[in-house]
Amino acid sequence: MNKFLLVAMLVAPLAVIGADEAKGKKKGEKGFISLFDGKSLDGWKVNKENPKSIVVKDGNIVIDGPRAHLFYDGEVENHNFKNFVLRAEVMTKPSANSGIYFHTKHQDSGRPDAGFEAQVNNTHGDPKKTGGLYAVKDVNPAPAKDNEWFKYEIRVKGKKINIKINGKLTSSWTEVPNAPHLKSMPGRKLGSGTFALQAHDPKSVIHYRNIRVKPLK
């Protein structure tokens, strides 16, 4: 057999497998738009509290320092999201605490009053762990580990919020009028708004990357 023909016969199936794998990787990402370029904080705005707590390093948003919040302020949906799927990859260092806010708005200081927080906390002392809807539908134990990248997904459609960690549903909640446990948090209402990443305290180090969103109708 011609050696070139033999090589072609061996390589062709591998090429097909590679193409199928590539299609598989893209399949779940259709309609998603990147919110972070991996190089800068373009499209994002750090509030005035402690802006040095949030930087870009080695392709990641690195949170390390006193309390601050990084708000998405870019062009996608004019940074005003109602129904969406948000995905990000997150890595926590030991005893770190953070959060991903949604349906929120820029605030110069303090923790955002508007919107909800999806908790990021694997081993911090707070019993409210990663994958929970903070103080609304909490999770314990944590479904992820420190020093390992994990996949975070937040889906909001109508009055329903679903949170997944590494593809597994960890929290599901449907908003109802006058929920008793929300009376002390009047800003915890579904409506629309932007996203924010939290620097919780000086001892918390968290990395975020591959942040993207799929607006839903």
Predicted feature descriptions by range:
Residues M1-D20:
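N-terminal export/membrane-targeting signals
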Residues G18-K217:
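Carbohydrate-interacting regions of secretory-pathway proteins
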